[in-house]
Structures are given as C-alpha cells and as structure tokens.
Amino acid sequence: MSMPATSTKTTKLATSLIDEYALLGWRAMLTEVNLSPKPGLVDRINCGAHKDMALEDFHRSALAIQGWLPRFIEFGACSAEMAPEAVLNGLRPIGMACEGDMFRATAGVNTHKGSIFSLGLLCAAIGRLLQLNQPVTPTTVCSTAASFCRGLTDRELRTNNSRLTAGQRLYQQLGLTGARGEAEAGYPLVINHALPHYLTLLDQGLDPELALLDTLLLLMATNGDTNVASRGGEGGLRWLQREAQTLLQKGGIRTPADLDYLRQFDRECIERNLSPGGSADLLILTWFLAQI
C-alpha cells in the first residue's frame, strides 16, 4: 500500500500517536456495526434492509480502512501550512485509494464509503491540529474539518446538468445536503446533539451499548438521511424520523427490555427497505469523538 503523491512536507508527529488515532477510527467502525439491534442496519442479528452485505463484510472493510487512516492524519499534518480550503483536493486521492482497498476487501460491496469521507476528514483535521500544536477536542476537530469543506455543497450539489448524481437529485428535490452539508457545517448533529446526549447517558451510568442505541435513535429522528430518502423518498424519511422520535418520547432505550421496540422497528424498516446509513456514519463519528 503506497500513499498517493499528495504532499512533500514531512511531519513531526510520533508514529505511535498517529496509530493511536487510527486505531480509534477502526474501533469506532467496529463498535457501530456490532451494535445490536439496529433498525434497518447490518448488525450481529441480521443484515437489516441490505441483501448484498453481511457483518463480516464490515469487519473486513474496517480493517482495510484502518491501514489508510494514518495517511489522512499525515496529510493533515503535512498540509498544515496550506489554506484549509486547499486540503480537500489533496485528501481525495488518499480517499479514492482507501475506497479501492475497501472494495477489494468486500468483493465490491460498499460498506463504509461514507465513513472513509467523514473519518478521513476528521483524521486529517487531527493531523493539522497536532502539527500546529493546537488542542485536539471534538469541537476543534469538527471545525477544522468544516474549514476543509468550505463551499463543498455549492460546488458539488448545486450543479445544473442533465446527468445528476443521486446526491444532486436529493438536494434539488428535497433540499437534503447529506454528508457534504454535515461536514461543511462542522457536524452539528454530532457536536450539538448526539455527542452530548451520549456522554450524558454514560455519566448517568447507562450501559454503553444502550446509550449508543439511544443516541442512534436521536440521530435517526433528526438527520435528513439521504440513504433513507434514496430508498423511500421523502415519505420514507419522514416515517423513519417520526418512528424514532416516538420511541424517544416514550423513554428511549434505557433497559434491555426496551430492545424489543428496536427489534420491531428493525422489522418495519426491513419491510420498507429503509436503512439509515447516514445516521450510522454519524454514530461512528460520535463514538470516535467521545474517545478524544
């Protein structure tokens, strides 16, 4: 595995520190996929609304991606003197190479494409902050990632042409900005909602898995998930958001007995062919940021 020629400067970061953050990224991906039961998503119980992927695909994918996370951190450090808006172009070749390894590991199944984008951004932000001797906190990491993505939504979603991508169609039809919009805004759903919610539940002594499942419900209730909208349209997205909000209003996931509600929600998502993959990606970031 060779790193694309995207930078020439060297980094002063310790390899052990780089590997530590890369390991957290890998653990975040595994924590999310192993979390069960998750409505419509692949987990230890079933494949959710997916017929083309299984738990083992995600395990292989996460391992393949882990090998590339240090490259994102290194590029973030090496490009620390560049204008932040110029960093994204340098990250793209690394992301594409990482994506290639993911597809090879899964025999062509798209398991973690969204996480390559989001974790890649956060890892590059961490590298930049470390190189500049600035604090590495959830807020500084997300604001730095946002600076890399300035103007991204305008450039990539507001294009008018006859061959629209799925993301462009959802933006034009429903106003959903998806992963690009969340990144450009500095991951407000994570920073302002999911992360404080998760940490509060942990402080209250709730089991970590139950806390994560409840946090997933919060994300599903608030996120304009393009994965859901692409499968079920606006109606499918609004239904999923309402169902998640209803469960939260009933008390959320606080005891093992509450998992029955999630199992029923899972069955309904499978029947409707809905999978909140965008919210799953944000849950990965939530767990990752909770560790730093």
UniProtKB/Swiss-Prot annotation:
Keywords of this entry: ATP-binding, Nucleotide-binding, Transferase
Enzyme class, UniProt record, top EC level: transferase
GO biological process, one term: prosthetic group biosynthetic process
Chemical reaction(s) catalysed: 3'-dephospho-CoA + ATP = 2'-(5''-triphospho-alpha-D-ribosyl)-3'-dephospho-CoA + adenine
Gene Ontology terms for molecular function: ATP binding; triphosphoribosyl-dephospho-CoA synthase activity
InterPro entries, A to Z: CitG, TriPribosyl-deP-CoA_syn_CitG
Summary of the function given for this chain in its UniProt record: Catalyzes the formation of 2-(5''-triphosphoribosyl)-3'-dephosphocoenzyme-A, the precursor of the prosthetic group of the holo-acyl carrier protein (gamma chain) of citrate lyase, from ATP and dephospho-CoA.
Family: Belongs to the CitG/MdcB family.
Protein name per Swiss-Prot or TrEMBL: 2-(5''-triphosphoribosyl)-3'-dephosphocoenzyme-A synthase
Source organism of the structure: Escherichia coli O127:H6 (strain E2348/69 / EPEC)
Phylogenetic lineage: Bacteria, Pseudomonadati, Pseudomonadota, Gammaproteobacteria, Enterobacterales
Gene name of this polypeptide: citG
